[in-house]
Amino acid sequence: MMFDTLGKRCCPWRLKPSALLFLFVLCVTCVPLSVCGCGSCRLVLSNPSGTFTSPCYPNDYPNTQSCSWTLRAPAGYIIQITFNDFDIEEAPNCIYDSLSLDNGESQTKFCGATAKGLSFNSSVNEMHVSFSSDFSIQKKGFNASYIRVAVSLRNQKVILPQTLDAYQVSVAKSISIPELKAFTLCFEASKVGNEGGDWTAFSYSDESLTQLLSLEKASNGYFLSISGSRCLLNNALPVKDKEDIFTENLEQLCLVWNNSWGSIGINFKKNYETVPCDSTISAVVPGDGTLLLGSDRDEVASLRGSIYNFRLWNFTMDLKALSNLSCSVSGNVIDWHNDFWSISTQALKAEGNLSCGSYLIQLPAAELTNCSELGTLCQDGIMYRISVVIHNDFNHPEVKVQTKVAEWLNSTFQNWNYTVYVVNISFHQKVGEDRMKVKRDIMDDDKRLVLWALLVYNATNNVSLNEEKIKQKLMTNNASLEDGLRLCEVDVNQLGMCSALEDPDGFSWPATLPSVYKQPCPNKPGFFMTRACLSNGTSTFWGPVDTSNCSRQSNEVANEILNQTGDGQNLTSANINSIVEKVKRIVNKEENIDITLGSTLMNIFSNILSSSDSDLLESSTEALKTIDELAFKIDLNSTPHVNIETQNLALGVSSLIPGTNAPSNFSIGLPSNNESYFQMDFGNGQTDPLASVILPPNLLENLSPEDSVLVRRAQFTFFNKTGLFQDVGSQRKVLVSYVMACSIGNITIQNLKDPVQIKIKHTRTQEVHHPICAFWDMNKNKSFGGWNTSGCVAHSDLDAGETICLCSHFTHFGVLMDLPRSASQIDGRNTKVLTFITYIGCGISAIFSAATLLTYVAFEKLRRDYPSKILMNLSSALLFLNLIFLLDGWVTSFGVAGLCTAVAALLHFFLLATFTWMGLEAIHMYIALVKVFNTYIHRYILKFCIIGWGLPALVVSIILVSRRQNEVYGKESYGKDQDDEFCWIQDPVVFYVSCAGYFGVMFFLNVAMFIVVMVQICGRNGKRSNRTLREEVLRNLRSVVSLTFLLGMTWGFAFFAWGPLNIPFMYLFSIFNSLQGLFIFIFHCAMKENVQKQWRRHLCCGRFRLADNSDWSKTATNIIKKSSDNLGKSLSSSSIGSNSTYLTSKSKSSSTTYFKRNSHSDNFS
């Protein structure tokens, strides 16, 4: 009975209509959140952008809806909504259906179509949208899109350069930059593109536009300019030579300077290094200037990229502080905040992946560290000790209490008007009576804990902060302490400083906070004495002065450097730069260098020369200058000669007496025993030296009185390793000898009547043809140095393995050799003649290649067979090869690197295409004449085109992808004087593999095909009995000549252009190859009978015009009668298959398909 009753109640068809109506109303009123098939309309949207719509859009929205959307963005953003479509039931005051928009300040209702196409912005980082509909009249609804819009600089970066003055990015006028005796400057930057060039990242200048502080990249390195002093930063930047420090990704760079250091600290890519800059000692950066991002000068470009999170402090941070530097540490002089900057919206770009950008998830508070670990962060600020009493209601462990209090202090001071740092927090520990008092306090209430924190305030713009303000700030933020922690008491006291002090020795120590203070040693630049300001918790006092660095002698420092460069030491480019700077400092400091110190320094340079050439390149100029200065300062008071020999370097110094005719000569060779590295001789010289210098007898005559005082010595330096002499601007000449340097005192001698004679042995075992004498010019290649031949000539009387150079001045001398692909072996006159022939020939070839191509394109009957189509492709390749070659020199004159690279790559491509199509001509002849039977090839011409154009394109593409474009293609000089420039392949490996090697393969293939084809022609023509011997020879000769130009046999002259036959074969090569297009036109177009008929029919008039009824087909009917008569003719005209009747008469029927495509060509003669 019970189950029966239950069953009746559960059957819906047994319910009364009133009950059904009740259930329907209940469903509609209580479940309006989702509509069948339309999804939920109560959402929280936190994506950077997106869309949302009314329920069931674009269909009509249902009745009785109540929807809401919350759009949320991180701090520093606002929300922008745009209604793409809007159609809601319209009524006065929107009393029926409506959409409500809450932007954080006000709420607005919309209905009808009023909001369509409109955009609305929120005033905060959150916006609420609600939609409701009543029980009747449905409409289409709305479609809205939303996007975050960054308003805080934390979420935006600055794009540089900004060319218009109105868009320049500068510090706001309301911000006054104070006078700086120290600073820490950090910013993130990126660079667009790989092109080089000078740039400026930021510049700070006064009203007269005098630069006071800037970061620049120049041709010879990266510089930080401080009050007129330029400090080279290269040694501290972990980047390879010629690479930019900034890439496409933002990287943070921090610069630290104090006017008492004489150096600059650089933190970049998690690497902290210092570089010396003695000229900034005691320097001051004046205040009240203007700071710009980018360059403030027209002659220097701005960094092309972006800058982000630029912050400046008027104190220094050490490695620990920089490593722990977080986004919450605001710059006390300049911060990355809207209030500090004047930036046009055109210069800003918002991104969602910035290092200090806002996120919806709250980032953890920064970890606090001890002030002692932060170096000079605490040195220039005012320090306060904060004592807080916390009531621990829930008996949390002390570690948790300390963590929560640290987070509370950090958040309390994070966005305050004063720039302060909480750098330490700990539980209060005391001794004696104070300790007993604390203990009694805790016994009275075991939930009370006393914590001490150290607060550092760095005053900016003379804004004062006192203890009462700090205490008030903490008390008003009491509510932010959570988890059962209550603030009971706060006590703030300013920590004392060590008072200013002057020692009896005359050293002044300024008033400072507890830290280590250093100042330069007297009469010893680059070294510092130190003194610590100490604290015992209640007072501060000065510690003893540490002058150990000042007492170190140059010999001691040099020996330490020598140990750093000894055997087994792997020196990087940065290490070598640092070592050269240290040695330079020692050499500059000493007035006279004795033999002991000089030997140590020479051994340092010798060890450096054992490093790789790439690591030596950056420091080569400074190293050479330092070696020259070292040679000039070697002490000669006790001896007339000084010899210093090392493994890779030797120095000889000899005294001179002005007014005498006995200047010193010098020679250096290998020793007769193994007791030393080299053997030097001043005087008559050795019999077989590695290098020798003979000075002219009248060298010291006619010197001015001033110069006579300076000329007391002659310095000779021999370089066994030549890694310091790398000419980055020339890839054609290579150094093939040792390097010998010679100088007289400290003066410049040039334009000598009688030249100085330098004999140098070659380091290469192979014979050096046409050696070039040159000297090392340190001003070339943007101060990187390079070889210069001015004032030096090679003596005509040369022995194998050495060169005698006659020069009219003194410096570093060496012997160069031109690489085999260079044209410097050709004298200037022949170079001009060959250039003239080449350009005239290429012009003629381009004209007739175009004529050949135009003929076959214009007359459809001529291009029906395979040989004609192959000839058209070969003519196209030749035409573009000649045109690009003719335009190349003109394009080079523009000096646009990218355009030069493109032209060189195109020239390379069409050269390879020409080689390839000549090879395909040979392969086609082989197939047509030798492989006669069963040689049908599907899509024959298509496959040839894929090979003929695709293979060169593949080679050039691989080169462009696998190597940097500017390393492979670029400007090349040619001619003996290297004055003419051409866009071509720079890399010798690429040239020999992809040009010489590629051509070699094609050439030998064509030679083989040429021989096979000529054997076939001569064999078949020899069977004819109705032709005289003279006719036979002439026909075969014409076949040889026509095939020679068609298959590019004349390019083989390049293999014979060396040694004594170089000039004749260069002329043959230039004449025949530049006119290849003309010869192809003559033999394979103008002399073809079917071409002549088409010309006469369509281009001639009068008696020369061929009658229209003289049809081509009539001639074709006579082909059978001509038999092998025309074989040589058809071959010489590139119409291999035109004699198909003869060939197919002997072939199987299966070959007919192939040869019928070749049967439409006529024969010439």
UniProtKB/Swiss-Prot annotation:
UniProt protein name: Adhesion G-protein coupled receptor G6
Matches recorded under PROSITE patterns: CUB, G_PROTEIN_RECEP_F2_2, G_PROTEIN_RECEP_F2_3, G_PROTEIN_RECEP_F2_4, GAIN_B, PTX_2
Region (GPS): 773-823
Site positions (Cleavage): R440, D441, F810, T811
Segments of this protein annotated with the region Disordered: 1126-1165
Biological source species: Mus musculus
Ranges of residues in domain Pentraxin (PTX): 154-356
Major localization listed first in the record, in broad terms: membrane
Function in brief: Adhesion G-protein coupled receptor (aGPCR) for steroid hormones, such as progesterone and 17alpha-hydroxyprogesterone (17OHP). Involved in many biological processes, such as myelination, sprouting angiogenesis, placenta, ear and cartilage development. Ligand binding causes a conformation change that triggers signaling via guanine nucleotide-binding proteins (G proteins) and modulates the activity of downstream effectors, such as adenylate cyclase. ADGRG6 is coupled to G(i) G alpha proteins and mediates inhibition of adenylate cyclase. Also able to couple to G(q) G proteins.
Disulfide bonding pattern of the chain: C41-C67, C94-C111, C186-C254, C231-C277, C498-C533, C521-C550, C773-C805, C792-C807
Outcome of gene disruption: Deficient mice die during organogenesis. Mutant embryos show signs of myocardial wall thinning, hypotrabeculation, defective mitochondrial and circulatory failure. Defects in myocardium are not caused by heart defects but due to placental defects. They also display severe congenital hypomyelinating peripheral neuropathy. Conditional deletion in osteochondroprogenitor cells leads to defects in cartilage and spinal column development. Conditional deletion in the endocardium does not affect heart development or function.
Feature: compositional bias, Low complexity: 1126-1154
Activity regulation annotation text: Forms a heterodimer of 2 chains generated by proteolytic processing that remain associated through non-covalent interactions mediated by the GAIN-B domain. In the inactivated receptor, the Stachel sequence (also named stalk) is embedded in the GAIN-B domain, where it adopts a beta-strand conformation. On activation, the Stachel moves into the 7 transmembrane region and adopts a twisted hook-shaped configuration that forms contacts within the receptor, leading to coupling of a G-alpha protein, which activates signaling.
Domain called CUB: residue spans: 41-149
